[in-house]
Amino acid sequence: PADPLTEYAYYLKALIFYEQIVDVERDADMTRKALLAFEDLLRRYPSSPYSRDAQLKSELTRSHLAGKEMAVGRFYLEQEHYAAALTRFAQVIRNYDRTNQVPEALYRMAESYLSLGLTEEADRVSAVANFNFPDSVWTARLNEVYENPDREGPKGLLGNLADRALS
């Protein structure tokens, strides 16, 4: 439609979803709907006066969705469900590669691989982290683990979960 208020209506629709986003521990349905609505606005009206705000908010919703995946992945990691955790962290890297969650996702992937005894995979993830995020706190933490002689197991990352449970 050529009505000048149409793009504003698309923007308001996206804002309605966006304003209902709570936190990463809750259902991400509104976050997904907000992202789709902002992307729809940007696709239909790329030079709209709302485009800049829509772009910013779509980046924030992507970061929020990545945070949700990270929260679920951390939960699986704490439960020692390493394969499920790896799936979540890989989704962050694959689907939300421009978010600030990626360095931690790489760290947690290495953590999961080391917990499974898959040191070659952990080494590859560490190399990716060092190449792409050399100044990240998460890469520094990962490098500290690699300096630890006991790096074959989960100690040094989450620590020994069994020892924690007993204390």
Report the location of each language-model feature.
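Acidic, polar-rich low-complexity tracts and alpha-helical solenoid repeat scaffolds
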Residues: P1-S167
